Amino acid sequence: MNRNAISLFSSSGIGDLGLKANNINTVIACELLKGRMDLFHCNYPTTKCFQGDIWKLKNSIIDYYRTTYNEPPFLILATPPCQGMSSNGMGKMLSDYRKGLRPKMDERNRLIIPAIDIIQALQPEWVILENVSNMVNTLIYDENNILTNIIDYIKTSLGDNYFGNPVVVDAVDYGVPQHRKRLITVLT
């Protein structure tokens, strides 16, 4: 059985440790920042690494997977940047907006769009999305420049192909000695 995964917004691969512990092989990773991608590659030397802007790399990721593997991935893990969604990030963003230093909408929140494009193209059996709990309240402009809730965008884009709902979990409930609330969405 194919137990291949694709990791989007991979950072150094911390999220992929859980996949590895469950015999799921991350075969492709994508990360914007070179230092993080280099560290990911050290941690997972056999993984094909795509470093750079996911908007520019999404077709290369899709093409590479399709030409290398003859079946859909088992799982896609996507952990897009949270700065525009977190309460700390929002406070700084709104402060900078009031000072005229940045636009009101954080473009990083739209990075879910190329991730969804990859999911739609490759049709994995499972999808895991992880982010801050405030993701449920985040608005983005979709491809048609229509303002929409990011969770509604995900559900509408994936349609009837996937079932699942976002759930807020707190790390303290899983043995971690601190409160750290995250929004986890598992789709199948």
Language model features by range: what are they?
Residues 29, 51, 77, 128-129:
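Generic enzyme active-site microenvironment
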Residues 5-56:
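SAM cofactor-binding core of SAM-dependent methyltransferases
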Residues 63-75, 83-188:
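Class I S-adenosyl-L-methionine
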Residues 18, 39, 43, 60, ...:
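A generic secondary-structure signal
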Residues 4, 23-25, 45, 71-72, ...:
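Short loop/turn motifs at secondary-structure junctions
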Residues 52-57, 169-173:
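Conserved SAM/SAH-binding loop
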Residues 15, 57-63, 72:
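Conserved N-terminal glycine/acidic-rich loop preference
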